[in-house]
Amino acid sequence: MIILLVGSGGREHAIARAIKNSPLTSKLFITPGNPGMQKLGECKNIPVDDIEGLCNLAKLIEANLVIIGPEVPLVKGLKNKLNNIGIKAFGPTAEAAMLLSLIHI
């Protein structure tokens, strides 16, 4: 399975490590990633708010699954757009992410 992981933080680093260790993973791409994540997958320098760039990368690498960590691409509709072009994505829709971003604890 070819997986694209969006993000560069500690949570995404932990997810990348788990994906890398899965026997189901044939290739892991990470964007934008960080220096420590380069050991786990191939990092591509696409900002998390570049929705078109992320969709184009997912098509180019023929991703079977995109895992979206940060809130910004979720609120901007990355999952919605990926689903519209036939690419499976893990994360809430833009509407659900927007609702979650409005909740203050």
Question: What is the predicted function of each stretch?
Answer:
Residues 1-95:
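ATP-binding N-terminal substructure of ATP-dependent carboxylate-amine bond-forming enzymes
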Residues 66, 103-105:
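Conserved small/polar residues in nucleotide/adenosyl-binding loops
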